[in-house]
């Protein structure tokens, strides 16, 4: 499982002309689910989303010390199978991505665990397997790329 985590001032997802998810200050998280992902991969990404310290303390004197829960932030969780690409020449190939029916179950499990371990009203999502327009107001910018198969 891969995740691109961005610190944002706000974010929204529009699908079929309707805003389907939006947040204020927090994290926008793009998630790619691989064919061989397990519950352990989901748990790793979950822990990182909730635990990653990308905000300073309140007076700004110490950087990288607070996570999304500590700032009472929100999470915009968006499925993005294209993160699982491999390049075949100049063309991306997505055979490493989990099939949509199975990926939806994994994505929903991640969403539900985030809501359970943080707060249901703090977790917004896009529409799974739909074309979406994503609008973000990046803060920093701060962007982190995680891969559950390459843990540090």
Swiss-Prot record:
Q: Where is the protein localized?
A: Cytoplasm
Q: Which GO terms describe its biological process?
A: tRNA metabolic process
EC number(s) from the headed UniProt entry: 3.1.1.96
Write down the top EC class of this protein.
Answer: hydrolase
What's in the keyword line of the UniProt record?
Cytoplasm, Hydrolase, RNA-binding, tRNA-binding
**GO CC terms in record:** cytoplasm
**Domain notes for this protein:** A Gly-cisPro motif from one monomer fits into the active site of the other monomer to allow specific chiral rejection of L-amino acids.
Name of protein? D-aminoacyl-tRNA deacylase 1
The species this protein belongs to is: Leishmania major
Gene of this entry: dtd1
């Amino acid at each position: 499982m891969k995740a691109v985590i961005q610190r944002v001032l706000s974010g929204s997802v529009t699908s079929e002309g309707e805003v389907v998810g939006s947040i204020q200050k927090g994290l926008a998280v793009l998630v790619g689910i691989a064919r061989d992902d397990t519950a352990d991969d989901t748990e790793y990404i979950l822990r990182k989303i909730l635990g990653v310290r990308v905000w300073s303390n309140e007076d700004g004197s110490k950087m990288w010390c607070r996570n999304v829960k500590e700032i009472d932030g929100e999470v915009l969780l968006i499925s993005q199978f294209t993160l699982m690409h491999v390049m075949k020449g100049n063309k991306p190939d997505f055979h490493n991505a989990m099939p949509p029916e199975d990926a939806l179950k994994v994505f929903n499990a991640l969403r539900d665990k985030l809501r359970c371990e943080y707060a249901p009203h703090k977790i917004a999502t896009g529409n799974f397997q739909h074309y979406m327009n994503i609008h973000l107001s990046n803060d920093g910018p701060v962007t982190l790329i995680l891969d559950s198969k390459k843990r540090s």
